[in-house]
Each structure stands twice: as structure tokens, then as C-alpha cells.
Amino acid sequence: MDRKAAIAEYIKNEIMRNKNAKLDYDDDLLSAGILDSLAILQLVAYIEKALGIQVPDEDVVYDNFKSVNALVEYLQPLK
């Protein structure tokens, strides 16, 4: 499973708690209420543990977490 699909699956299964939910890679996760502050922390922990990528605190900003595509683009140069 590629990084984008893995992140989307994690969001659907662990944050939305609905593996059958529709989640487009460009959906605004924050405006839609899918990600809140606690969910972002959970997602960062997943990225660090499952993908082995350290996410600096100063990089946890709206532009990097607004969608699955934005997050994958942010993560690309990190590993």
C-alpha cells in the first residue's frame, strides 16, 4: 500500500471509525471536522511510528494537514 492510501485508510479506520466512509484525497479534513487537535496528534503519532517519519512540532500547521494530498506532499521530502 502506498503512503497516500495508508494515510487515507488510517484516517477512515482510526479517526473516522468508518472503513466504508468516502474520503477523497483533496477533502479539507479540518473544515469538514474530520481532524481536530486530538486527531492530528493521533495522525502524527501514526506517521512517526508506521512510516518512520519525524514530524517537527512547528510543521503541524493547517496547510500541511488540510487534506491527504497536502499531507503526502509535505511528507515527500522528509523520507
Question: How would you describe each model-predicted region?
Answer:
Residues I15-I34, G52-V61:
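Phosphopantetheine carrier-protein modules
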Residues L41:
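Conserved catalytic core of two-component sensor histidine kinases
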Residues V60-P77:
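C-terminal structural segments of small proteins and small subunits
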Residues S37:
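Catalytic nucleophile serine of serine hydrolases
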Residues M1-A21, E73-L78:
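Thiotemplate assembly-line natural product biosynthesis machinery
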